[in-house]
Amino acid sequence: EFAKWLSPYAKLEVVELPDSTVAKEGLAILKSLERERNAAVVVLSEEGREFTSVQFAEKLGSYDRKIVFVIGGPYGLAPEVKQRADLLWSLSKLTFTHELARLLLFEQLFRATNILHGGSYHNP
């Protein structure tokens, strides 16, 4: 649902890679990112920086290029993927399935774009 709500604000493309070992998945992610050389890469990671929704909206608004978000598989992410990131972002100190992380990411993307466009979805 949030993906549909995002459509007025941003083009959204979901690329899923098959579950694999951390090393193989890392190589596949890096290969996929090769075609996105100019994009800002935001990797979701427990070790990442936490933001309030308003701070995240401001960060999102500061990028002047395409943004690629990376969510790891069930065994985490290869160090090389984290090193490729322009930003390591933590949704929470909790661990989520990648499906739930995607839903939370979509909701926060919608919330952030709504904040940036002066919408009424977010109540401070």
Each language-model region and where it sits:
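Structured adenosyl-cofactor binding patch, chiefly the S-adenosyl-L-methionine
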Residues: 79-123
